[in-house]
Amino acid sequence: MENFRLEQVELPDLAEGQILVENTVNTVDPYMRGRMNDVKSYIPPFDLNKPMTGGAVGVVRESRSEKFQVGDTVSHPLGWQDIAIVDEGQAKPVDLNVAPAAAYLGILGLTGLTAYVGLTRIAEIKEGDVVFVSGAAGAVGSAVGQFARHLGASRVIGSAGSEEKVARLKELGFDAAINYREGDLAGQLRQAAPEGIDVYFDNVGGDHLEAAIARMNTFGRVAMCGAIAQYNDTQPPTAPRNLALAIGKCLTLRGFVLGQYLDVAGEFRERMAPLIASGQVRYDVTTRHGIEAMPGAFLELFTGGNTGKMVVQM
């Protein structure tokens, strides 16, 4: 917490093509942790002593844009602040009659698109696949499990960190759910997937990836979306120790970042949005309140404090 501070600043006047947005909901996401390391990556690190950024939904209070009027609700990438000056090209209209604001930051937004891309483009899910997803009670993981069912999976297995989350996964339609905090992850997964795994959607890395490799069937596919178990590690990871199995099993392990697949958004909305709107795909939101809660909400992502999408209501 000592690495964050809250500041009040004077905002400049709007330039042509800009809007002033009062944020109502801000998101925090695990990928932000990677932007706190000064290393070369797919996205530049955050600048020291400058505002954090992230997804947000808010109401236009002033406008010098022909695209947006005062009172419009928009989503944009300048969260972590209560008021933002946004270029019109960064904003997208949001219809709160279709879904609440948090949904546009989660299941209907980049979170849902991440799950869909990982399954369809990276893991190339097929009819009858057995799918395992780690971090399954999180925003992406819970979407993966439900999308997989509608994309033809014959069995869906998830891992989570409490009995409450395990119960929730079963309510969401997972065939089996593992509480990894009970230990013997490999043994639990062996019991949950007696016929092996065809697709592993990895949000965790480490021992989860090791356990999944051990249960993967020949020609299995791993979509490597995140490695939350390692983001705060100061020592080299101890797992996976069985990567050589990928050779004999002819496995495909493929990492991805969403920015390379934004052109899939239209297909995602066409196929998945009706399922979300009808309630066939459900989603959870964990809410904290006030701009002061942003750092704490972010840190909770790494200790299991969220079920589904973590947002901060202004």
Spans of features found by a protein language model:
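C-terminal hydrophobic helical "lid"/dimerization subdomain
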Residues: 259-314
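Mid-domain Rossmann-like dinucleotide-binding core that forms the NAD(H)/NADP(H) cofactor-binding site
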Residues: 105-183
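NAD(P)H dinucleotide-binding glycine-rich loop of Rossmann-like/cofactor-binding domains
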Residues: 52-59, 67-135, 280
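Glycine-rich phosphate-binding loop and adjacent beta-alpha segment
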Residues: 169, 207-281
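N-terminal Rossmann-like NAD(P) cofactor-binding module of classical short-chain dehydrogenase/reductase
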Residues: 75, 132, 178, 200-201
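Glycine-rich beta-strand-centered segment in the early N-terminal region that forms part
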Residues: 10-28, 36-80
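A generic alpha-to-beta junction signature in SAM-dependent methyltransferases
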Residues: 125, 193, 216-217
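Short amphipathic alpha-helix with an adjacent loop that forms part of the alpha/beta core around
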Residues: 184-195
